[in-house]
Amino acid sequence: RILDAAYEAAKGSAKIGTTGKGIGPTYTDKVSRNGMRVGDVLSADFRQIYARAKARHESILRGLGYEYDIAELERKWFEAVEYLKRFNIIDSEYFVNECLAQDKSILAEGAQGTLLDVDFGSYPFVTSSNTVCAGACVGLGIAPNRIGEVYGIFKAYCTRVGSGPFPTELFDETGARMRSIGHEYGAVTGRERRCGWLDLVALKYSIMINGVTQLIMMKSDVMNDFETVKVATEYEVGGERTAHFPYEIGDDLKPVYREFEGWKCDLRDCKSYDDFPAAFKAYVEFIERLSLIHISEPTRQA
């Protein structure tokens, strides 16, 4: 965490809005082949492994000129290590593949959106790992051909925490309403999420990268009382329109919107698709038509 704070401070106004939990520095250690692994806590040389990592990190902090006090964090960290030792630490890749061999169902849930992926997201405003579907393969140790259905879960509007490009962001009362009604605050930091209209360019890009087979839309009830609802279908850059997600999103990029009539009812009262108002169905079917993917839903008995 201290390294995370030091790196952010060194970037000044160019900071990326990290959660400050030390995720980036942890991945830096991993990629440089200096990182500690969970299995190390069981090693007889654990203290020496830790001491080497600590010395390396302190050298970086001195180079950045960052003042810090590690005592309290270090105490909590060693408490966490002792807690971790209580668990049965296994080679999980064998466990998962044995379950697959027994025809057991495994649900892998991603914690972050496609545009936070370190390779395919809005770099450098990304996390340090692969948040796309392929990340499940390297995260679990399974082959790509073992993946079955890929469910693309998205909100009926867009949100983002921290810095980074957001073409459909709303800076007005509408965006504030989305945030308030949708309780849009960061799960880790509690920061206000930036809110905006649904971006179909970004959604279609995410569908392509992940190989999505079914879409699941959530939080459409946040806009129950909206008079109109908009969807970005294309971007306009330099006077030309494109439906491709660009390598870099600059200030000259403008979203092109399609406006829909609001459904003006409480969707929570609907028990099946037939119960939905025509305005909401038009919104859903438009997204399906442009994304070429069906929006599915659980039954009320699921």
Briefly describe each language-model feature range.
Residues 1-290:
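TRNA-recognition modules of translation machinery and tRNA-sensing kinases, especially anticodon-binding
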Residues 293-294, 301-302:
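Single conserved hydrophobic/aromatic residue that forms the stacking wall/gate
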